[in-house]
Design a protein with these regions (language model features):
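Short beta->alpha connector loops at strand-helix junctions that form conserved
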Residues: 2-9, 76-78, 248, 265-270, ...
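Catalytic donor nucleotide-activated moiety binding site of glycosyltransferases and closely related
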Residues: 183, 193-227
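Nucleotide-sugar-dependent glycosyltransferase catalytic domains
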Residues: 1-176, 182-204
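A short, well-ordered alpha-helix in the C-terminal region of glycosyltransferases
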Residues: 308-322
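C-terminal alpha-helical cap of glycosyltransferases
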Residues: 323-330
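C-terminal "capping" alpha-helix adjacent to the active site of nucleotide-linked donor transferases
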Residues: 282, 286, 291-308
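A donor-sugar binding/catalytic signature common to diverse glycosyltransferases
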Residues: 53-55, 229-277
Length: 330
């Protein structure tokens, strides 16, 4: 283990606003972290002389260090595998495209800085994309990976690694709806209020996880059929849920599919949008077209009452069982 916290550059104060939304900021962070840890980590690696370096696809500096030291590299990918073909799935708004174009001079300047330090990076997409010559572990099934036929046999699709808790044994008297926007961009009080307004009069129960930074007292009167809490054991809840309104993070979607729970899709970032589109393609959920209470209610009831969504989710979940990963029970 190489402790690196003391060598990490400070995180930008506005990181919540930029995470997943600003490509130039991602390149900035990558270059800053790579160069800040360079002497420490490269020194340790040269002393250890490892036979292989395994690094998360988001920890791009792992790939850069391996390439610089000419050490075999294995990429561990917790999202979809990403190449030039699947990049087309990352649909961007006009404002996002303009922001990317305006950031290109800054991105190119940072790439030149990397090259001055001996990292042979020509184009920014080399930092982000998986290539067909690199051994890559992908924690989803080949059935759920978009355009899986475009990836070489260097890619191993293991399925998600899920530690399944024992069922609670609780018997439900009516359907259970689970709502969560994840752990990052979850301070959305107006949306939570709309959810309560949408479902307070329906004959169902709702668990809504709002994150530790949301002031629950500021949401007003909590309906009797709602549990509004900062965080939950998501795997326990999904074992009993009938519909999941989700931000479409890869982990959340994988867990939902594993338990055969259909979804209402409310992505917050571009990569979550790609996950949402794939869920819709396989028939396991529908996009939420708006934030109004009436739209939320209609979307959730549509998924709840139409069995084909649960059947589709269960089909993808069954494919996880046939993948190479083992599922752990705790």
């Amino acid at each position: 283990c190489i402790p690196c916290d003391d060598f990490m550059p400070p995180a930008p104060k506005d990181i919540d606003k930029k995470v997943g939304r600003d490509l130039s900021s991602l390149v900035d962070m990558t270059v800053d972290v790579t160069l800040a840890m360079e002497d420490k980590v490269l020194g340790e690696l040269r002393a250890w002389k490892p036979d292989c370096i395994v690094s998360d696809s988001i920890c791009i500096w792992g790939k850069l260090y391996a390439k610089k030291l000419n050490v075999p590299f294995v990429c561990s990918t917790t999202t979809f595998a990403f190449n030039q073909q699947t990049a087309r799935l990352m649909k961007q708004s006009l404002s996002e495209l303009l922001r990317m174009l305006s950031g290109m001079p800054r991105i190119n300047a940072r790439l030149r800085q990397l090259r001055r330090h001996g990292y042979e990076i020509r184009q920014f997409y080399e930092l982000l994309q998986n290539d067909n010559d690199t051994e890559t572990i992908v924690y989803t099934s080949k059935e759920f990976q978009p355009m899986s036929e475009t990836f070489s046999d260097k890619f191993t699709f293991t399925g998600p690694s899920i530690a399944v808790p024992k069922p609670s044994g609780h018997k439900k008297s009516r359907p259970l709806i689970y709502i969560s926007l994840g752990t990052v961009l979850n301070r959305q009080e107006d949306f939570y209020i709309s959810c309560m307004k949408a479902l307070k009069s329906e004959a169902l129960d709702v668990i809504m996880s709002v994150g530790g930074r949301t002031d629950i007292s500021g949401l007003g009167v909590i309906p009797d059929n709602f549990q509004v809490i900062p965080r939950v054991n998501q795997l326990e809840v999904l074992q009993e849920a009938d519909v999941f309104l989700t931000h479409c993070g890869m982990n959340s979607v994988s867990e939902s599919l594993y338990f055969g729970v259909p979804m209402v899709l409310f992505p917050q970032q571009p990569e979550e949008g790609a996950v949402a589109r794939r869920v819709q393609e396989v028939g396991a959920g529908i996009p939420l077209p708006g934030r109004e209470a009436s739209v939320i209610r209609e979307s959730i009831l549509q998924v709840l009452k139409n069995a084909r969504f649960r059947v589709a989710a269960g089909g993808i979940g069954a494919a996880y069982f046939s993948s190479k990963a083992s599922i752990c029970f705790s």
